[in-house]
Amino acid sequence: MGRMGITFLCKGIKHEGVKLSMESFLDTIWNRNLYIGIPLGAFCCSLFLLFCFFHTMRNRTIRGLRLVLTACLIWTGSVSLMRLGIFPGITFWHNFALLGLLMIPVFMYVFLFGFLEITEHDALIYIYGVLTLALVLGNARSGTILPAPELVNRADGTFVYVYHATVGTGVLIAMEIAVMIYATYLAHCKIGTNVELRKKLFPLLLGTVCILGGNLLCMLPGSVFPFDMLGSVGTVSYTHLRAHETCAD
């Protein structure tokens, strides 16, 4: 393989032409490289939560939660495969991860609008979703918005991924923040003075902000820690568990 990758064999793993035992592979994932262990943990967490909603009631709110979890699975799963170097390569999985990441806030608003029965702004969600899909497809073709990260090998045998922001990245971030502020304003107007409801829905906003913040930290020069995934593991779990309690009420 042209890039650092992992090819699964019957008796072990081949990594840059060297066979590794399964024990070494697990050591690489969980003990030596947070860049692999954290996204795999986030993937398992999202998968578990999705299973929890399989036998729940079917309405717009629950469908929104399932869509959020599905987007989380696409994001975390694609990031895991990208960081493992699985075929067809970094760029391919990077674009799938970007799709999952950007669809999380879209589906968050599907849940939020469904729970608060905000129906007069459904067109906003559809437009937002279509624009997001078009943006990801455009980035996959040109790489001008958020290029695939650079793989950097370190002296201790581990590796990190370094993201390089562009002008398009700044425009994307500004758009996401603008939509988040507008959606929060609509929710605020709908909730009014209902303090209990506001407390229950606050984790949704917190989760979206932390996921966005974690990805922004990864864009800082010299940043080599996987803030993107670490910022989402606990927050997304808390968000969905609280949302499940909200729906149960």
Label every model-predicted segment.
Residues 32, 78, 197-248:
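Interfacial "cap-and-anchor" motif at the non-cytosolic start of specific transmembrane alpha-helices
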Residues 21-28, 152-167:
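Juxtamembrane membrane-water interface segments that cap and precede transmembrane helices
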Residues 141-157:
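Membrane-interfacial helix-loop-helix modules of multi-pass inner-membrane proteins that assemble, modify
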Residues 29-46, 57-144, 165-178, 227-236:
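Individual alpha-helical transmembrane segments in multi-pass integral membrane proteins
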Residues 6-9, 13-30:
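Short, strongly hydrophobic alpha-helical membrane anchors
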Residues 1-4:
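Methionine residue identity
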Residues 54-55, 115-122, 186-201:
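Juxtamembrane membrane-water interface segments of multi-pass membrane proteins
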Residues 48-52, 108-111, 173-193, 241-242:
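Alpha-helical transmembrane segments in multipass membrane proteins, preferentially the mid-helix core
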